[in-house]
Amino acid sequence: MFLGTKLFPVSFILSPLKTMISFLTYNDTDAPTPFDMAEVGLNPRHVARWIRAVAAEYGYSVGNINYLFCNDEQILAVNRKFLQHDYYTDVITFDYTTAQCLNGDIFISLDTVRSNAEMVSASFDHELLRILIHGVLHLTGQADKTPETKAEMTRKEEEALALIMNYESIVNFKGVSDGVLRIF
């Protein structure tokens, strides 16, 4: 988890006895705050179940995953500071996976998700789900640096999206979330 100027692995901050998927708003000067998934029309409990199902498809359990939602300028700053890359991106995954247990921080630029959705004529929620699972696929070891691995990543994203049995129960959720899910 990013706090101030240091990178702290989630496993050192959160209780190791609980499985947690957190949805947070990244703030580059303070600690992250809860992000209400309902604001973007997604049911956080169903999204967490889906993430766990996808992880299981690849032989992993879920430990602690933090999704940190930010804007383009914030993700650019993270990209420059920690990866020495000088470009905007939609997602950055910091992998703390141990054995077969997924752990990591996944930064997502909501600005880029919106523009990507418009560019490919997809809904915002569909593109956000694709990016959420893209980060999880990175935690399972999937790369996307070459044309071949990018094509494989896209195929796996589509397979993961197909796992959503009841899409309407995930999208268009009107409930309230504290931004933290504890899955036991």
Show the residue positions of the predicted features:
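An acidic/histidine-cluster motif and surrounding catalytic segment
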Residues: 2-128, 139-184
